[in-house]
């Protein structure tokens, strides 16, 4: 199911156009359920019952805000990758951006960058490499190697900085690569 969030009841031209194009594109994919929500009630539903949504498409302003909300519901804004897919150009990033407040402190959780890279690798047809990176990231988390934002006493085995977390993923990725 794909859900569009807009505020086309008020923003009739801009969000109205987004809603219209969403409906046109959805008609090209009759096997995928498509629905529309007004962004304010959709945001409340997303915060309360995130599992009710599979894929949510939004204009950039709402998407930038709600992707951070959804990531925080999942545990940290540092965990989610993001993809902006266009006809000719696509962009992949961590949803939290560059974390300038964390610059030079070895604190930022690089998970969003890893997951943005995984999305990019899938997008460019490098599924095997994406799987290796994703599995190495998952194994790092499962091993309890966590950055400050997700560190939890009794669950985490080690609190690490940005560089050490990235090195742990890289190390496991090399080991997983040898297995396949």
Where are these regions (language model features)?
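Glycine-rich phosphate/nucleotide-binding loop
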Residues: 46-146
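Short alpha-helical patches at coil-to-helix transitions and adjacent helical residues
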Residues: 15, 110-114, 162
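Glycine-rich phosphate/diphosphate-binding loop of Rossmann-like nucleotide-binding domains
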Residues: 1-40
